[in-house]
Regions:
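Acidic, metal/ion-coordinating pockets
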Residues: 2-11, 23-64, 68-500
């Protein structure tokens, strides 16, 4: 509101106006003439536009009855006012303002650890007719895995079958019945990682059959492939967001470095399979970085809007990532990966928020190891008596696409899990999701004994001790970035409105 100001007058005395008795009469005549002119113009405009004044009609009983039974007239759109038709003025409509940028779609990915099928675990699936069913392993996890748009697990076994001279076996050469894939699919998993140190445990036959079997059951494979012509990576559209993913594993150190062979779990890969697995030699990383960078370039050329690296690395049973793991993670961050998810140590390792040395404004979330999803690595069976080999998790990441087309990593989260071992009424290895929001129901929902409940609680604490700080830092950073984006979008819209 403008400040009220009193009228200003010139200096000196006010000039006295000459009085005239005829002035009011003249002014009145002028006003009457102006009104008549305006009325005449308005009437002419109405007639020209087809309008006419309605005639006044006395209401009779007949006309009243007709009015009650007559159909209602369609209400016509209101035209311009008389003032607008007389003087041509238009009501100024506000300019159309752009909507603030907002999320138009999200894509969530959930990742669990090593599906490590030791023989005691395999035996729990055997049925009286000779078939296998492993659904009991995932009976409690399926609700959480199926809630993700894309669920991923590391298949740390081969699928060579039992009709070509191979027997089902656990450590050290894993070969599991095909039904493990059915169980994973039934639990909501969509993609299996197969680049790991056990992918050649049943030689070339088992290597290739694993790929074809997983695909034949409707799941995807990443890390190994059946043909050299297939890409080493995948670009998958999830809810309108294209996510580029790649899976690599470390190689065993060569017995003869000059032979040019690839080694996995003390096995020498055939020349064919050596070209069908994504792998790197620890300590010889330059060629690995070049290859990964090429994958990253191709993924983006194929439309990838977000990128994830799944990597099999590190030292078994070590809860702290090695120096080499950290060096590789930093290099992958510098390349531009959004998320890094590791496996192989069979224990959970820490999470970290990494800062790119190329672009300090760019961050990467890294979970160094997801631990075991399922295994028989019980405290009683292990030299490591801490219980960490019984611990697993479901790590989730959510990408969001905004209305301007940009995609961001919006959130990460972690669900601790624990593998229970039951012997009654039959032996089972169910994965227990340790959802803190229902902690008071763990025992009743999952059928835990008092001893098992204590084991679950200890597992939860171990996992949070290892990952809590890094996950919390990542979550806080991502939340701040989202808040800043929303503030920037709002400021841009406000500026546009003010300019208009």
């Amino acid at each position: 509101m403008s400040e009220y100001r009193s009228p200003k007058y010139g200096k000196g005395r006010k000039r006295k106006r000459k009085q005239s008795s005829s002035s009011p009469i003249v002014i009145g005549l002028v006003l009457v003439m102006a009104v008549l002119v305006l009325f005449s113009l308005g009437l002419r405009l109405l007639l020209n536009s087809g309008g006419s004044a309605p005639a006044v009609e006395m209401e009779t009983p007949e006309t009243a009855a007709a009015a009650e039974t007559a159909p209602a007239e369609t209400v016509k759109e209101k035209g311009p006012s008389l003032w607008q038709r007389l003087f041509g003025s238009k009501e100024t409509e506000p300019p159309e303002m752009p909507e603030p940028e907002h999320v138009v779609s999200t894509a969530s990915i959930a990742v669990t650890g090593d599906v490590l099928m030791h023989m005691p675990v395999i035996n729990t699936g055997l049925r009286s007719d000779g078939s296998y069913n492993f659904d009991s392993i995932f009976q409690y996890l399926n609700t959480y895995a199926s809630a993700a748009d894309l669920a991923v697990a590391n298949l740390e076994t081969t699928l060579a079958g039992s009709d070509k001279g191979y027997k089902y076996s656990g450590h050290p050469a894993f070969n599991c019945p095909d039904e493990i894939v059915d169980a994973l699919k039934n639990a909501g998993f969509d993609l299996l990682l197969t680049a790991n140190n056990h992918c050649y445990d049943t030689s070339e036959y088992g290597f290739l059959r694993t790929v074809t079997t997983v695909r034949s059951k409707g799941l995807q494979v990443l890390g190994t492939r059946a043909e050299v012509s297939e890409p080493k990576y995948a670009v998958q559209e999830v809810n309108g967001i294209k996510i580029g993913m790649v899976n690599y594993t470390y190689q065993g150190l060569p017995e003869n470095p000059t032979a040019g062979k690839v080694y996995m779990n003390r096995n020498t890969l055939s020349d064919t399979c050596a070209l069908l697995v994504n792998s790197f030699v620890p300590g010889q990383l330059d060629s690995f970085y070049q290859e990964v960078n090429q994958c990253l370039t191709e993924m983006k050329a194929n439309g990838a809007e977000a990128t994830v690296m799944f990597i099999h690395w590190g030292n078994e049973y070590q809860t702290t990532p090695s120096t080499e793991q950290q060096q590789i993670a930093q290099q992958l961050c510098d390349m531009g990966f959004d998320v890094i998810v590791g496996g192989h140590p069979h224990v959970i390792q820490s999470a970290a928020l990494l800062t790119s040395r190329v672009d300090p404004d760019r961050k990467t979330v890294c979970l160094y190891s997801t631990g075991n999803a399922v295994s028989n690595q019980r405290i009683a069976e292990m030299d490591l008596k801490t219980g960490h080999t019984e611990d697993g998790l479901l790590f989730s990441m959510t990408f969001s696409k905004y209305s301007d087309g940009t995609v961001y990593l919006e959130e990460v989260d972690l669900l601790p899990c624990w593998v229970d071992l039951r012997t009654e009424p039959q032996t089972q290895y169910p994965i227990i999701p340790l959802d803190d929001s229902i902690r008071d129901q763990w025992q009743s929902l999952f059928g835990l004994t008092d001893e098992a409940l204590e084991g679950a609680q200890k597992s939860y604490d171990r996992t949070l001790e290892l990952t809590g700080s890094g996950i919390r830092q990542a979550r806080e950073y991502l939340a701040q970035q989202k808040q800043q984006r929303e503030a920037d979008y709002l400021a841009a819209v406000t500026e546009t409105q003010e300019a208009a």
